[in-house]
């Protein structure tokens, strides 16, 4: 299991309590899951068909007042996250969206509006509706502009948590475009040499098409790890690796409790000597594209992270870009395929079986889901879904 976990640490920012061993070069999933249950003391996963997960999310969101089409957009994204293996941003996040609608900090019945527009750019007001609805509107607008004039650059204010950034960049890839998506987030990250958190994990996604349905899909935070990994370490009462967080004195700490109690996350790279200032710079770049260009909340001015009892509107800023490679040198997908294959063909280090490119772990997870006829969930996640259904008086999630 060691090589599996190392591979996941390199390419993904998952809550590792949620089936982190699923991505493996071997797709003999029954044996893999059995091994996980025996060696890691984890119960066997429960499989649920994608269509059923999708219908369940829609049922829940409509029950709390979201428009049907908005609920569908959110469900598209959450199911995609779980299908791709990003369990921290799929069904696991449903309660957050429900609480935002029920609590009135997110609006369930408006639409995004365009406030400024040129042939290549647009400035959108999300009007405080669900982030995935805003994001879908913006990336589709960017793609349309890229088809017409070669590039589409769309910024939005008044948005909310939009899920995995890769979902939007992949929309562009499906249209033969290069896609980019960025969002600012609640300030949990301590900038290099600072004492307090002032920036979000501010994710970046860049995706590009290659031949034969291959692609490059980078989807990463600009912090070293996701907040969920630190929370998980605290629950397990285990120490953390270097570079994950600092205590309230600004000193690097291996104690998750110290990081969560007045400390903060470290930028990608960790300490300054290890290049953390570069992650800090990337997080500020995302703020430039998202908060500064759009006039949304930004940096330390964004509301604090709270998934249960939120009282403030998020007013997140987001940025979506589509580039038409046909406007540049011929043979783009050929070269992209060549580069991908050159990386995959590199000799792996001892203990590893293959070199992956961004997007490969997700492809393996999707293949595994397809082979098993559904998405694998931890039994606790199914229990949570059952309790959620009962609280909303909707039909339970049906398992395979």
Model feature map: region roles:
Residues 37-53, 288, 297-400:
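Catalytic-core signal marking the mid-to-C-terminal active-site face
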Residues 37-50, 55-74, 79-80, 87, ...:
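Acidic, glycine/proline-rich low-complexity segments that act as flexible tails and inter-domain linkers
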Residues 1-35:
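N-terminal mitochondrial targeting presequence
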Residues 189-260:
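Phosphate/diphosphate-binding glycine-rich loops and adjacent basic-rich segments that engage nucleotide
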Residues 238-300, 305-307:
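Secondary-shell segments that build the walls of catalytic and ion/ligand-binding clefts
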Residues 153-211:
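Glycine-rich, Trp-frequent "lid" loop and neighboring beta-strands that shape
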Residues 89-143:
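Active-site cofactor/substrate anionic-group-binding motifs, chiefly glycine-
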């Amino acid at each position: 299991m060691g090589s599996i976990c190392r591979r996941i640490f390199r390419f993904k920012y998952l809550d590792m309590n949620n089936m982190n061993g699923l991505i493996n070069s071997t797709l003999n999933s029954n044996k893999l899951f059995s091994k996980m249950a025996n060696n890691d003391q984890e119960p066997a996963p429960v499989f649920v068909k994608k269509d059923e997960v999708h219908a369940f999310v829609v049922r829940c969101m409509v029950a709390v007042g979201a428009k049907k089409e908005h609920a569908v957009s959110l469900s598209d994204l959450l199911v995609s996250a779980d299908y791709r293996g990003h369990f921290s941003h799929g069904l696991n996040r449903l309660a957050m969206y429900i609480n935002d609608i029920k609590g009135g900090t997110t609006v369930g019945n408006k639409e995004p509006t365009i406030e400024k527009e040129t042939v290549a750019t647009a400035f959108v007001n999300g009007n405080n509706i669900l982030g995935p609805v805003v994001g879908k509107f913006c990336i589709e607008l960017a793609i349309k502009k890229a088809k017409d004039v070669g590039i589409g650059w769309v910024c939005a204010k008044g948005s909310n948590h939009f899920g995995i950034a890769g979902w939007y960049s992949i929309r562009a890839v499906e249209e033969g475009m290069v896609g980019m998506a960025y969002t600012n987030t609640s300030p949990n990250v301590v900038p290099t040499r600072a004492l307090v958190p002032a920036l979000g994990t501010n994710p970046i996604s860049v995706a590009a098409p290659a031949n034969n349905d291959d692609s490059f899909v980078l989807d990463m935070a600009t912090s070293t790890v996701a907040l969920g990994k630190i929370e998980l370490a605290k629950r397990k009462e285990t120490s953390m690796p270097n570079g994950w967080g600092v205590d309230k004195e600004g000193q690097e700490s291996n104690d998750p409790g110290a990081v969560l109690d007045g400390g903060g996350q470290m930028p990608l790279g960790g300490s300054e000597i290890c290049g953390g200032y570069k992650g800090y710079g990337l997080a500020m770049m995302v703020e430039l594209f998202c908060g500064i260009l759009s006039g949304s909340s930004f940096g330390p001015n964004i509301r604090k992270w709270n998934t249960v009892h939120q009282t403030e509107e998020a007013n997140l800023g987001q940025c979506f870009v589509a580039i038409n490679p046909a406007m540049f040198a011929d043979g783009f997908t050929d070269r992209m395929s060549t580069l991908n294959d050159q990386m995959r063909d590199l000799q792996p280090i001892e203990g590893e079986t293959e070199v992956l490119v961004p997007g490969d772990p997700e492809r393996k997870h999707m293949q595994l889901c397809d082979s098993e006829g559904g998405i694998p969930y931890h039994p606790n996640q199914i229990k949570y879904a059952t309790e959620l259904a009962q609280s909303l008086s909707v039909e339970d999630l049906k398992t395979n």
